[in-house]
Amino acid sequence: MTPANKSDKDRVVIFDTTLRDGEQCPGATMTFEEKIEVAEMLDGMGVDIIEAGFPIASVGDFEAVAEIARNARNAVIAGLARAIPGDIARAGEAVRHARRGRIHTFVSTSPIHLAHQMRKSEAEVLEIITATVKQARNLVEDVEWSAMDATRTPIDYLCKCVEAAIAAGATTINLPDTVGYAVPDEYRRMFKTIRERVPSADKAIFSVHCHDDLGLAVANSLAGVEGGARQVESTINGIGERAGNAALEEVVMAIKTRADVMPYWCNVESTMLTRASKMVSAATSFPVQYNKAIVGRNAFAHESGIHQDGMLKNAQTYEIMTPESVGVKQTSLVMGKHSGRHAFQHKLEELGYKLAENQLQDAFVRFKALADRKKDIYDEDIIALVDEEMAATHDRIKLSSLTVIAGTHGPQRATMKLTVSGQTRIEEAEGNGPVDAVFNCIKRLVPHEAKLELYQVHAVTQGTDAQAEVSVRLSQDGRAMTSKAADPDTLVASAKAYLGALNKIVMKHQRDVPAAAAS
């Protein structure tokens, strides 16, 4: 349905070639079942044309195209064919059961291709175009013809090829930037010139098909639309030969987001883009780069303190589209070394903490120190940090520094600095292992009778830089006190946990003495 205040002549037809050109990407082969699943997703999200494969390439490709053609509910199903009679017949057979089938046939037109690959003259190629397009048109009503390497083809000859294809019955004319050589203004002018110079141009829809060798595939695709093309060929996640194709999700969101300067529209349901991206990534085993536009993990993630502050005040300060518009649940404020105090406070409130000003500042300082040491900060890291901070507020004994020397030979040695009731104490001790050395050091610095009953370690989060959470239980005079502490360094976490339990024993003793005297 044409949207309000938009005309049908400004509709951009979205042609997806993930299952054909995308699968030609080395290593991106999909199984029969995966192709069917991807095709169902594309059909369901409003893609207009699905190029389901290259039927002559293999029995498996033929069967996949035929099955997709039988099951498609809305999309036109296209099969690719070289300008060879056998290819065209095979493609026609594959799509014959589709509600709407298309044969997409192509031939090279550039001088370098004609001389070194085709070994044909310009006149011979014109004859091939006429014959093969007519053959395809006898099999289906919808025929697309492509001029391979169009952007390196002289414009006069390209006009003759286009005219011949339309005269033979082509309903769509595709002018690909096969090797990703064009720049946007050049590509725009090519379409404009051909549509002006070919008398029958209004009898066909013009199509763009851009590769990303210079990183210009999406920009060139949009430029082609501005030049008069009304079909864009693209792939999910931009997968394809060499550097890939124009990414479908980027084309769609550019059209939707910049409707203020581009009066175009398309039928694709953008809220399904992220799901489609994940499906194709899983099927091809090609991970999506983190900073990939629209569907990358970081597309709606913010770590910079300045950006996070702006996002908390008004999301439009740093987001030009909503995450929900592409199927992402919400924006992510990533906590890291670049995060600011405002974002840290917001994260604490999300986690259920409301700290006093001095507690917040202390926790923020410790958070920044942790972020300098740890690549990924998870909610569990922040919870462990704040719980430890709140528990340590009234501690009499505090860890200032710890150095441990450990190795395969000889005893392990720990050197520790503690602040005890405001006074600094330094000591070193040996032990049967680094943890034993740390605990022996504490016993020298703060002599006590408490016995170690429990020592447990587990990782708070995943990864080699995960924080270790250590639990320690000490008992004295029949009473047991347990404390937990977390740190990327297991030995530091062990010292903090031990001191936490020891502080609880000290505080308990201080409360018990006045109570005994009063009785």
From Swiss-Prot:
Cellular location(s): Cytoplasm
Keywords annotated in UniProt: Amino-acid biosynthesis, Branched-chain amino acid biosynthesis, Cytoplasm, Leucine biosynthesis, Manganese, Metal-binding, Transferase
Cofactor(s) listed: Mn(2+)
Primary location recorded for the protein, binned into one broad class: cytoplasm
Pathway: Amino-acid biosynthesis; L-leucine biosynthesis; L-leucine from 3-methyl-2-oxobutanoate: step 1/4
UniProt domain Pyruvate carboxyltransferase: residue ranges: 12-274
GO MF annotations, alphabetized: 2-isopropylmalate synthase activity; acetyl-CoA C-acetyltransferase activity; manganese ion binding
The keyword Manganese appears for this protein: yes
Signal peptide: none
One annotated Gene Ontology cellular component of this protein: cytosol
Substrates-to-products reaction catalysed: 3-methyl-2-oxobutanoate + acetyl-CoA + H2O = (2S)-2-isopropylmalate + CoA + H(+)
Gene3D superfamilies assigned to the protein according to its UniProt record, in alphabetical order: 1.10.238.260, 3.30.160.270, Aldolase class I (3.20.20.70)
InterPro entries membership: 2-IPM_HCS-like, 2-isopropylmalate_synth_dimer, AIPM/Hcit_synth_CS, Aldolase_TIM, LeuA/HCS_post-cat, LeuA_allosteric_dom_sf, LeuA_bact_synth, PYR_CT
One Gene Ontology biological process: L-leucine biosynthetic process
Binding positions for Mn(2+) per the UniProt entry: D21, H209, H211, N245
This enzyme's EC code(s): 2.3.3.13
Region (Regulatory domain): 398-519
Complex and partners: Homodimer.
Similarity-based family: Belongs to the alpha-IPM synthase/homocitrate synthase family. LeuA type 1 subfamily.
Function: Catalyzes the condensation of the acetyl group of acetyl-CoA with 3-methyl-2-oxobutanoate (2-ketoisovalerate) to form 3-carboxy-3-hydroxy-4-methylpentanoate (2-isopropylmalate).
Stored HAMAP family: LeuA_type1
Name the UniProt record assigns to this protein: 2-isopropylmalate synthase
